[in-house]
Amino acid sequence: MSDTNHSTLKVSDFSFELPDELIARYPQEQRSASRLLSVKANENSIEHKHFKNIVDEINAGDLLVFNDTRVIPARLLGEKVSGGKVEVLVERLLDDHRVLAHVRANRAPKAGAELLLEGHVKITMLARHDALFELKFEHDETVLELLEQYGHMPLPPYIDRPDESSDKERYQTVYNREPGAVAAPTAGLHFDDEILQQLRDKGVNSAYVTLHVGAGTFQPVRVEDINDHVMHSEYAKVSAETCNAIKQTKASGGRVIAVGTTSVRSLESAAQASTNESIEPFFDDTNIFIYPGYEFKVVDSMITNFHLPESTLIMLVSAFVGRDLIMKAYNEAIKERYRFFSYGDAMLLQR
């Protein structure tokens, strides 16, 4: 591949101009009605398809690895009891009553400050940990119960509209089961029950990881030399059952196909932490940063959405099929007016 020297890659090498109207503000009426851009590095090819074609692209004996995290309604609006508006975005659940959260206010609350959110939810500020605040929910109900009742879905900043009741269903995969994410693993949004059944009928296998996507996924890279970037941490879980499914798939000549960059990062984190040449169960925080030059240890193909310019995720997909091919694919997608970002269209990357 005629890619730029990896050691000299700059953030600006991953920039592209996106017309504002190509940012998808709403999902397609039907999940699987999205388009699919198929990119094959070994053939240096780009093909335009529909997501329904995904069944034809995946073979019996292949393993799809899904992230089963559930997005929580993590955004709460209200005021400090002492006065002044405040917005809380829960980043991580610590236990049934404590969280780490981002807090937006004219003046940051100090330890002991009390907040009243959505007119009902009483919160005490316990401590500050760098950019995050440790908050205690002063209720008998659990944090999750309170968020389900009063919280707003934490739509990404570029969707640029208030959340609506339909987002509670659509900004969520159909196979979610582990609450804790504050952003959806968006490649999975295209799968509906019908496509999942067609894949099962074909003999395609499934496995699950859990990575609770944090708000840090939307943080821009603030350094020009990508070697200087420090990734945010997220909790990932790769079970023994999933590791065994991967080993069996590889042994029988099938492909491990990661659904979404969060599944990629979970699997590659588990492989990196392994004490042998294989993959071992992983239950830990990961801040893995995958960019060109990275040697993939587990993932053979991936399904992903289109990512923000200069983001760590466009760097990850560039690491997989090459920066030049990714930038060419993105430019073609813009020309063909694909829908971008969380509620947008999908890519299938093979090599």
Swiss-Prot record:
Monomer. GO terms for molecular function: S-adenosylmethionine:tRNA ribosyltransferase-isomerase activity. Pfam families: Queuosine_synth. It is an enzyme of class 2 (transferase). NCBIfam families: PRK00147.1, queA. The gene is queA. The keyword Transferase applies. It catalyses: 7-aminomethyl-7-carbaguanosine(34) in tRNA + S-adenosyl-L-methionine = epoxyqueuosine(34) in tRNA + adenine + L-methionine + 2 H(+). GO terms for cellular component: cytoplasm. This is S-adenosylmethionine:tRNA ribosyltransferase-isomerase. One of its GO terms (biological process) is tRNA wobble guanine modification. It is found in: Cytoplasm.
